[in-house]
Amino acid sequence: GRLKQCTIVLTRGCNLRCDFCFEKEAGYRAHDRLSLDEVKRIVDLCGDANVRYVFLTGGEPLTYPHLLDVLRYIKEEHPSITPTIATNGVLLEDMGFCQRLIDCGLRYLDISMKGADATEWKRATGFDGYAKQLRAISNIVSTELEFTCSMVITEENVTRVCEAVQAAHESGARHD
């Protein structure tokens, strides 16, 4: 069989402090990240293996200082690879940043929802970012970039998952 995807953990650093995240145990070490050369070597191996999707994740991959360089490298050196980012989306409230990611080659995005409202979001993450995430979804919708919304289901939010889906829908996310 063919290896279809590869996940690259770019950084352990994150701008949130989600109570359910595996990075919590690791200490959210922002300095614990791959070098640009290490990422390029991994991408080259993926290209040699005809990998179709490279998932860039973390921590929070949007905080990785060489992210745009990685996307450009994939676009220029391995155009058959579809780069995908799994993110909390908070930094995508900046429409200019969204556009730079797309211009550099981002082709797919997964935004991890953290709650059905601002209170639940802050309780889960330690950060008041609910409105920023909804703006980010609206920004992404306006770009035509393909994306999904996902959500870690916990005992605390299981009864409100449908409300979180509705909030994403009201921000412009479609369900196809």
Question: Residues of each region from the PLM?
Answer:
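Residue-level signal for the nucleotide or nucleotide-sugar donor/cofactor binding architecture
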Residues: 34, 65, 128, 156-159
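Non-cysteine beta-strand/loop elements that form the S-adenosyl-L-methionine
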Residues: 98-117, 173-176
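Short beta-strand/turn micro-motifs composed of small residues
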Residues: 10, 87, 113, 151-153
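Short, solvent-exposed loop/turn segments at secondary-structure junctions
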Residues: 15, 91, 116, 154-156
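Conserved radical SAM core fold
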Residues: 61-63, 89-92, 111-127
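Conserved alpha-helical substructure of the radical SAM core
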Residues: 1-87, 92-107
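Conserved C-terminal portion of the radical SAM core fold
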Residues: 49-55, 78-84, 107-108, 131-176
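Alpha-helix N-cap and loop-to-helix initiation/capping positions
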Residues: 30-34, 125-132
